Amino acid sequence: MVKEIVNSLPEASVVVIPQDSYYKDSSHVPVEERQFINFDHPDAFDWDLLVEQITMLREGKAIEQPTYSYITCTRQPEVVHIEPKEIIIIEGIMALVSPQLRDLMDLKVYVDADADDRLIRLIRRDVIERGRTPETVISRYERIVKEMHWEFIEPTKKFADIIIPQGGHNTKAIKTLQMSIGYFLKR
């Protein structure tokens, strides 16, 4: 959905900041113990750095965005240089969890996806991109991901200015969001 929105906007006007880039570094944790870290809990994120860098972008300053490896569960030495743009999209299922981050947002969007769609997306992503087995992904979903969704993600719906039902399949809502952002750019 984010790609569809970004592709409809002038390239020079938008930057996407993936929340996943701001996972805390786990390199100090022994490799065999990293599998027990709950990456679906808000404590897994470096909120201070994310808020600091979004603030910098809003002030017209460039940032050095961290990179994160899902394979090793560690922050990488490489960074991504990001120039400030008129539109900053913070992409992530926990983007509305932090009050400090919410305060930096002009428009807060919650994408409401069906539980089955969330599970299917998780399986596809973790098996294809992260080299995990379907069994491992399903087990993690049942033990951790589902509970974390209901405890931390679902409650943030109340902070959203716009709630998009049907996840990324809601073409009318996506078009409406594209028009809203386009209107903002013309102001």
What are these regions (language model features)?
Residues 11-16, 108-110, 161-163:
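Conserved beta-strand scaffold positions in the cores of enzyme catalytic domains, especially
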Residues 1-12:
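A conserved segment at the C-terminal end of the G1
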Residues 60-68, 113-118, 135:
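Conserved Switch II/interswitch segment of TRAFAC-class P-loop GTPases
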Residues 44-47, 51, 116, 134, ...:
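Amphipathic alpha-helical transducer elements in NTP-driven molecular machines
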Residues 76-130, 185:
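ATP-dependent NMP and nucleoside kinases share a basic, alpha-helical "lid"
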Residues 12-18, 24-72, 87:
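Conserved nucleotide-sensing/catalytic segment adjacent to the nucleotide-binding pocket
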Residues 67-76, 88-93, 143-147:
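Short gly/ser/thr-rich secondary-structure transition/capping motifs
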Residues 4, 83-84, 124, 128, ...:
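NTP-dependent small-molecule kinase module
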